[in-house]
Amino acid sequence: MGKLVEEFNGYRSKMNGRISETANTNMKRFLALDTTSYADGALNVRTKEMLGLVASMVLRCDDCIKYHLGKCHSEGVSTEEMNEIFVIANLVGGSIVIPHYRRAVEYWDELCEAEN
């Protein structure tokens, strides 16, 4: 894995552990809802992760973008498909999404380089 991917995954894992130590019942339910919402249903996991990525880009949440990029990569989304996802996110979100698009491409490239 590349540096960006390793740093993000390490920090996320560390802080998820910390959060789980202190989270109250309501927060635990919210986190469980997030997990179960992305499970297979009428839409498959792959589609839900692509939707999550578009929403994350439009909302300009870099951590969320990285998370969904990783999940999309794990679900076998191709670079061609990813480029179309980026187009939709920029169309919906407007030019303010472009800085997040740049970082998303950099992160996606690292994910793809790790395959080789």
Where are these regions (language model features)?
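Acidic, glycine/proline-rich low-complexity segments that act as flexible tails and inter-domain linkers
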Residues: 1-47, 100-116
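General structural signal for alpha-helix termini and helix-helix connectors
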Residues: 36-39, 70, 74, 91
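Mid-chain, well-packed structural core segment of small domains
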Residues: 57-86
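Short connector loops at helix/strand junctions that flank enzyme active sites
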Residues: 46-50, 64
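Alpha-helix boundary/capping and short turn/kink residues
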Residues: 24, 78, 91-94
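C-terminal structural segments of small proteins and small subunits
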Residues: 83-107
